Structures are given as C-alpha cells and as structure tokens.
Amino acid sequence: MSDNPGAGTGALPDLLYSDSERALSDSLTSLLADRGGADKTLARTESSQTYDDKLWQAVGADLGCAGLLIAERDGGAGASYREAAAAAEVLGSFVAPVPFLGSAVVATAALLSVASSDPAVGSSGTPLTPAKAAADLLRRMADGGVTTALAVPFATAPGSAFAASVRVAGSRPGDATTGVARLRGMVTGVADALPASVLLVPADGVPHGLYLVDMAAEGVAKAPVVSLDMTRQLCDLSFDDAPGTLIASGSAAEQALDAALLAGAGILAAEQIGLAQRCLDMTVAYVKERRQFARPVGSFQGLKHRLADLWVSVTQARAVSRYAAACLASGSPDTKVAVALAKAYCSEVAVNAAQECVQMHGGIGFTWEHPAHLYLKRAKADSIGFGTADAHRAALASLVNLPAP
C-alpha cells in the first residue's frame, strides 16, 4: 500500500504524504467529522462507556485501520508505519476514543515480531506453533473483530527491562497437554485494555516470555482507574492463576516487546502532531472571530507572535515525527534515534499547543463545555506514554554516545 519513493532504500524519505497516505487521511477525517468529532467525544466523557465501539467498528473495520500493518494475505491492508502515522495524526486531531494505538499498532507490532520468527507460519497444514498462534490472532484482528492490548503500563519506554510484575506460577491438571501456563500478578495503568478481548502479557518465570490471555478467562480481572485523559482511559489488570498460552520466550519475547514499545512511541508522536495542529487551527480560527476593543483579538501583535512561534514548532515537530514513521516503515538502522527524537520533541510541542489553545480561547477555553480541555489532558497523558521527553532524551544521548556531563 505504501508508495513512498524513499521507503526501504538508502534515500532520504519523503516527509510529505504520498497519494495513498493522503487518501487514508482524507477518508478518516471525513468519517470522524461526520460522526461529530470532538464535540461528540466531549459528550461521551460524561457516560460510563468512554471508548466508542461503533466508531471503532467504522474506523477499524470499515476503513481498515485495524489491519493497516497486517499483511494482505492475512486479511489486512499490507500498509506500513507511514500509513499508521497518517491515521494516528487524524485520530489525534479528533481525540478519538478508539483503541487504534493499543491494538492496531502496539499489539500488532509485537505479534508481527513473533510471527516473523517462524518462516513456516504462512504455510498451510503446518502444526500449531507459538508463531502460528500469533499469526492466527493477527488474522482475527485484521477486520477489527478482535481487539488486543499489550499488558504493560502506558508509561513504559522502549528499551525498558522485561516486565516482572506478572509471573508464571504453578499449573493445574491437564495444563501440560494443552500448553497452558498459569499467570499471577498485576499490571497497572494499561492503555486500551478496557475494550480488548485478548491480552499479550509479558511474564517472568519458567518459561519467561510473552503469553496470550483471553480477557474473559477465569482469573483475569480489569479495573478502570481515574485517568487524566478521559478519551483513553487506563485500567489495572490482575491475574490469579489465569491461563496463558506462550507465543514467544527468551530473546524472541524481549525483541517482540521492544518492537511494540518502539512502534508505540513513534506512532504516538504522530498522534501528538495531529493534536497540536488541531489546537493551532482551533486557536487561529477563534482569534479571528473573537473581538475586543472593536477589532479581532488576532490582530494584536502579542498573539500573532505566539501563534507564529507555535506554527514553527508544530511544523518542525511534524518533520521529526514523519521521519520517525518512515524509519519504522523501512527498518532503518536510524529508527531508535529517530523515535527517541520524535517522542521527546513532539511531547513538549503538543503540550505547549494545547496550553496555548486553552489560554488564547480566554474564559471559554477553561469551561467544561469547550473541548479544549480534552486536548490538554490528552497532550499531558501522551507526554508520559511510552516514555517521557526526559527519558527519550537520555536514550538519545546514549544512542549517539553523548553522555550527560
């Protein structure tokens, strides 16, 4: 699906949208605008159901965003991280309450890493192996029918140590013949797990690895937690002798986890750009129509300078974010550097854009009825997601051999 001329080569990638990326962005923008946009999301925050299942059906199944990264032979779109970033920009601009990041990006990246470890996965008639189990789950996820979440705290940064909060503990009669292990422990602050039907759980013990767990299985419990970002509610997951199926162990599990976290950080940066651009656009539109002293407030030089500075920072951040997505798409050796740079820079730009949006809207920007606070809360939560700006700057310094003084 990707038609970027620089993808997969040594050439510098094109940081502008390709035709297919533009088409995806336009289609998704039109769909979300027709569904009511941020105003409908604001109304939804007052209900007990924060995630919009019908919207996810339209975005994930009808537009194919659930299977963007999944191969066409498995029912997906066969697209790349460039298309995923284009979709994330739009979803961020609408603060859409759908599990695209958690399921279509993070969990999918982990499963793709596992499935790629077995060259026989695509063959018909092969026995059920851990890698084939991962490939089978990808096929079920491709049309949005199954939503999967990686059971790690939202704040987990790429390169973090393998999670040890869940352990393999004991067994029950018959487990050995079914390949089931029993998991115990708790994971706090997990994003996009509330609407998930399947969990990918990193667990320590014997064997140390990545396990598939059915959310409806005995011994699995989820508890929503009060989240700053009401459009992406976090939850705590607990496992009490919950049955899990091993799909990757040892270094393969660690590689899958790191691939997922790296993809999550890179695509989250794209979401932050969509959010920042929407905050800028809303603010510019407002200061053009809001009048004080018989003139639009946007004509005042102080506001002009602040908006000009914001436009420059958003434009710079977009270039950094799209370079990171292009590196993820091509498997560039520069990927870790690009993602660390993008997440560090885009986090601060998004928060600044949301703060300026609230402040330049004046009194109305501080009210519950205006959606500006949704953008500020999403920006602040995203700035922690998959590593803070400081964590990514520290990682970047290590990657380029530039230690702190």
Residue ranges and their predicted role:
Residues 1-92, 118-130, 262-405:
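Alpha-helical interface subdomain recognition
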Residues 36-197, 202-221:
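Glycine-rich flavin
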Residues 137-138, 257, 283, 324:
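Generic hydrophobic alpha-helical segments
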Residues 186, 216, 240-242, 379:
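Generic beta-structure capping elements
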Residues 190, 224-229:
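Single-stranded nucleic-acid-binding OB-fold domains
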Residues 191-192, 221-222, 246-248, 277:
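Short helix/loop capping segments that flank catalytic or ligand/cofactor-binding pockets
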Residues 233-263:
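A short, charged helix-loop
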